[in-house]
Regions:
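Structured, contiguous alpha/beta core segments that scaffold functional sites
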Residues: 1-30, 70-171
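General N-terminal leader/first-domain-start detector
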Residues: 1-65
Length: 171
């Protein structure tokens, strides 16, 4: 049995190498991601949104830009397969520090074995309260990602680079 997410991903990838599994995965990916020069494989549907047509058009344009950054026309099959086998996919949203108004300039794929979301609950003892049980109250929750090029090992004392949650896109 797998003890960590990284062990699970490794196991999933091993299973995907078996010819029968590989063929089944290919069938699923081919059904999900179709290649057609005249039509996109995926699109955002805004018909039921309660917004103006201008906002809907902006959403559609931004979605097309994300597909362009992902090179979805050429890499869509591979991206979907990675997500399907690993059960998750991560991208770092890169923004030009000198000109942040330009928005996201690049989406970098991150190996899911090398990144982990951390939810740290910071607790405090209520002021003026003396209790034999030493009750602590959850004061705030801090979320961030930890990235380690060598991979995330175990769950205790995770070492690596802390990354703000708003710079990572994942599912």
């Amino acid at each position: 049995t797998a003890k960590t997410e990284q062990d699970l991903i490794r196991r999933y990838r091993e299973i995907a190498l078996h010819p029968e599994c590989d063929m089944a995965i290919e069938d699923i990916v081919n059904e999900a991601i179709t290649s057609n020069e005249n039509k996109q494989s995926v699109k955002v549907v805004t018909d039921q949104l309660q917004y103006s047509s201008k906002i809907k058009q902006t959403i559609e344009q931004e979605f097309s830009e994300v597909l362009r950054m992902l090179q979805f026309n050429t890499r869509g099959h591979d991206l979907f397969r990675r997500w399907y086998v690993d059960g998750r996919i991560f991208f770092q949203k890169v923004i030009d520090a000198e000109n942040p108004k330009n928005g996201i300039t690049e989406l970098k794929y991150l190996d899911p074995r090398k990144i982990k979301k951390i939810r740290e609950v910071r607790k405090r003892r209520p002021e003026g309260m003396v209790s034999p049980t030493n009750i602590n109250i959850a004061d705030e929750t801090v979320e961030y990602f930890v990235y380690n090029e060598r991979g995330i090992q175990g769950s205790a004392a995770i070492q690596g680079i802390k990354i703000a949650p708003d710079t990572i896109a994942y599912c």
